[in-house]
Amino acid sequence: MSYRVQVRVMPRGGLLDPQGQAVEHALSALGFPDASAVRVGRAIELEVAAESRREAEARVRQMCDKLLANPVTEDYLLEVGES
Amino acid sequence: MLTVAVVRFPGSNCDVDALRAVERVGVMAQFVWHRDTSLHGADIVILPGGFSYGDYLRSGAIARFSPVMQAVQRHAADGGPVLGICNGFQILCEAHLLPGALLRNAGLAFVSKPVDVVVERTATAFTSVFEPGVRLRLPVAHGDGRFVAAEDTLRMLEAEGRVVLRYVPATEESPLQPNPNGSANHIAGISNATGTVVGLMPHPERVADPLLGVPDGLGFFTSLAAWRPPVSTLSTPNP
């Protein structure tokens, strides 16, 4: 089976996110002062061959822990779908 | 005789400056390509500045897995000195040879200018010639230089005296100056517990030549030249 996995990597809450702040300021300047708490992260999509959905998720978690996210500064969320 | 390996990643751009700074203090230096699996017998490693692998994913994240880094990991584990400058510091953090991480500058802008730093830890392979507390003016040039670490890691670094360089404390008038990037505790450089692995955001190799003004960076290289391996780790006796 091949699974399509979406990984969302976000700066850890509480850490200064200057990109999020800059985007928030820009939104406000463009007439969207109602936008707040903007944070900028990264989305990664990949396909992974695995026997089961659970195995696919476990493999991608390993990938996140090793490379896709920095455990010191980032958190990640996975969404596993069939491809 | 000491030899130094300057590692070249695709995107390194301070490699020649680093090599010349080493040669200036009379130590042999050679380039080692990122695909090499050995350091060719070098005693000391420098990971130079630049934008290895285009800074893809995170600065230093891809370089960490290049073949040569396996050799650098073994070298460091055996007590061999490693100096990471700028992108090299980012690589050392990604490789977990140093704690913490270097994130986008708090002001978002790429910062390229001289900054004043204080040398705190002198018990390292790269700062042994300095007097503790001496102030240096060194150039920085980075977009991702904001040092962050978990609270307990920061406490540990401070308690163990592992801050090697610190930006001169900020003033009320300019809360981000001269700390150019918002680093925690104004940290500009740290070391491992034994002082053999050092990471610096400023570029000493760019001010190691008297032709370019006051050579405040030269001491890092004269320290390196004075480093000697502990006798117990010598595996091949000299003839």
Q: Where are the regions that the model predicts?
A:
Chain B
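N-terminal beta1-alpha1 cap of cysteine-dependent amidohydrolase-like domains
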Residues: 1-84, 93-99, 103-110, 118, ...
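Glycine-rich nucleotide phosphate-binding loop and flanking beta-alpha elements
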Residues: 52-53, 89-91, 147, 171
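Amide-donor transfer/coupling interface in amidating biosynthetic enzymes
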Residues: 73-77, 105-239
